[in-house]
A protein has these predicted regions:
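Glycine-/small-residue-enriched transmembrane alpha-helix faces in small-molecule transporters
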Residues: 1-34, 69, 73, 77, ...
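Membrane-interface helix caps and helix-loop-helix hairpins in membrane proteins
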Residues: 79-85, 131-141, 193, 197-198
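Specific transmembrane alpha-helical segments of multi-pass solute transporters/efflux pumps
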Residues: 51-89, 94, 130
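Hydrophobic alpha-helical transmembrane segments of multi-pass integral membrane proteins
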Residues: 3-7, 31-46, 117-123, 163-208
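Alpha-helical transmembrane segments and their helix-entry boundary regions
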Residues: 8, 32-33, 64, 87-91, ...
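Hydrophobic transmembrane alpha-helices of multi-pass small-molecule transport proteins
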Residues: 44, 48, 96, 103, ...
């Protein structure tokens, strides 16, 4: 239980830092996600090549690539929530992933629902509902944040099975590659709908 709480606090801290940088970067949420996953893909693949000399990918790794797609869309909605609202709203909505995980994990893993976890995580839902009703300017950001937390709950639940293989670096690298390809395929259509969209980061964006 203590380890779970430590992991939760660490995840919230990382989400806060990521949210702050995402808010400071002038790029669109889709581009932020694309560049982030591309950079992570290159670094992790290089690490694997240096360590093992080669990377073996077979048909059994396809589901790992699809998990990367799921993670990519989670980040797009997370950064979208921050852009449309603010960092605080984005992070609070991210905390809602605990509520969704308490529902999704028993369903996927065929286990009993932990009513204690569900009750504790529902407190976040109560806080979000207060913000939603009292500040209409944040509603789009809250909706995007809720979708983001739902996607992350699915990702976290499915990723538990994948990480049991023990090849964490390879798994993460393949997920980053899958997410990068997904954003790459989406970007041409997205760019057409937003012709004024800047594709290249500024020097200030590179700092963050």
């Amino acid at each position: 239980m203590k380890q779970a709480f430590l992991q939760l606090h660490l995840a919230i801290l990382l989400a806060s830092c990521s949210g702050i940088f995402g808010n400071l970067i002038s790029l669109d949420p889709v581009l932020i996600t694309g560049y982030r996953m591309l950079l992570a893909s290159v670094m992790l693949l290089l690490l694997l090549v240096i360590k093992y000399g080669r990377i073996i990918v077979d048909k059994s790794n396809r589901h790992i690539l699809w998990l990367g797609v799921l993670l990519a869309f989670h980040w797009v909605f997370f950064y979208g929530s921050i852009k449309y609202a603010n960092v605080s709203v984005g992070v609070v909505c991210f905390c809602l992933s605990g509520f969704f995980t308490a529902l999704i994990s028993p369903w996927i893993n065929r286990k009993r629902i932990s009513w204690v976890e569900l009750l504790l995580s529902s407190l976040t839902l109560a806080g979000i509902s207060l913000i939603f009703h009292f500040d209409a300017s944040f509603r789009i950001g809250i909706v995007l944040g809720i979708v983001s937390s739902l996607l992350f709950a699915f990702y976290a639940t499915l990723n538990e099975r994948v990480n049991q293989s023990g090849q964490v670096v390879k798994t993460t690298a393949l997920q980053m590659v899958g997410g990068t390809f997904a954003i790459g395929l989406l970007l041409p259509f997205y760019h057409v709908s937003k012709s004024s969209l800047s594709l290249l980061p500024s020097w200030e964006d590179l700092v963050f």
